[in-house]
Amino acid sequence: MSNRREFLKQAGIAAAAQSAIGASGANAIVVDPKPLFDISPHLYMQFMEPLGTTDSSVEAAWDYDRDDWRKDFVDTVKDLAPDVIRWGGIYSRYYKWREGIGPVARRPWHRNYAWGGKETNRVGTREFVDLCRRAGAEPLYCVNFLGDGEKWYRNTPEGDRTGDAREAADWVSYANDPDNRERKGHGVAEPSNIKLWQLGNETSYGNQTFTRDEAIAATIEFAKAMRERDPSIRLIGWGDRGRGANQLWAGELLKRAGERLDYVAIHLMGQSPKRPDTVLKGLRYQKEPERAWEELIELSNNVETRVSELESVIASQGARTSIAVTEGHLSLSPHNANPILCEWLSAVYHARSLNIYQRHGARVKIATGADFEGNRWTVNAVMLQTPRGVSYLMPVGSIARLFKKHNGRQGVGVKSAPAGLDIAASRTAGKVYLHVANLEYRKSVEAAFAVDGMAVTGGRVFEIAPEDPRQCVWQDQPDVFKPREATLASGPVLKWRFPAGSVTAVELDV
């Protein structure tokens, strides 16, 4: 009887709250608490790639005086708390993993063909995995997939830089086999147990890489060889379109190799502005920031279009394969270095993109909104002052940190919400979480909170709301986008006014 009385009591409170919302005339965010899917722990991945002379990235994060990762960098990464860190990118086409293992003094330098200069190999498998472990992240490696078919890497002045299926399989053994002699010979007794591996990076892009059929054949060969070494690994195949193709590679990839793959990858960094007179080039946005805001919302629409397209292709194959967005930074002109990404203006794109990934969380299981770290590219989540100094989060990093720290385990739906608010909702026992982006450049939006069949008894708000959308983060003001915390005022109706352009995480007690 006591359970029934409690149920009737809660139902009465919920009904009274709904009635009060109606009487007040307040616009409400109404949540349907029915669980729709489990939220992946890998929606806030970061992507690390040695970038040579283009952006010091990995080298900038290493402290050669201490012979360790920079302490300020590690502290910032722990605060960011990514669930996965990926190593790879175009760099994987000529990366030879064995050059980055064993005694440091014996590791050779190698040319960074895509990004200029040379890499020291000071950071290899052991050091990368160590960073992941310190941050509480799972490592993800993009293997050398026969150089993605780019023939030039077979005959470089330094020799053949491509890697075959056996080389990739040997890496799996080195990382995961408890009895691997090669690893033990380097003084590393325990395996790393790396479970996430990607086959192919942008394999469909350009005119020098594999054809679709060649890539699928290589995917089958690599998957078979790698899983023979460790059947428990999870593999990501390349499924984007390329070479003017109208269709994604994913359909044919899943038809022929789907049973060998856990994820299909696409990249969403190449969002080209749609307007012929766009202000999202160079410094044009500084004269018309509100128009830049509008264009960034338009670009975020394409993220949803691309994700929905891949969902449809996977469903058409009857596959259970998940989606992995393994690169998703906002690349604007000048290439990856537009200063708008230092400003809060860019928040509307980043917050909405991350919300899209979570709303599509039944299929999207790995995602990222940025490159990881560096000292020049503004697409980074973490910016490093060099040669030493502070590390700090860019707007995209601050939003990823906010959403990651205040999130539930199951995705739920939003039945209704005031115009101008973009929302992703989730829940865990006793709490409902809302990730809210106010897409209005000039207007605040007030909303009451309601959860169907449940009483909202209290809550907290964590909000980033600069007064000026042109607010910029920099090394002399690294904490300008630190969230402000507030408690929702008690009453028959819990409400909050979301400032113009704000990004907010709301925790509701139910």
Specify the residue positions occupied by each region the protein language model found.
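N-terminal secretory signal peptides and thylakoid transit peptides that target proteins
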Residues: M1-A15
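Bacterial Sec-dependent signal peptides at the C-terminal "C-region" and cleavage site
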Residues: Q18-A28
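Acidic, Ser/Thr/Pro-rich beta/coil linker or hinge segments at domain junctions
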Residues: M454-P499
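Short Pro-Gly-centered flexible turn/kink motifs
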Residues: W496-L508
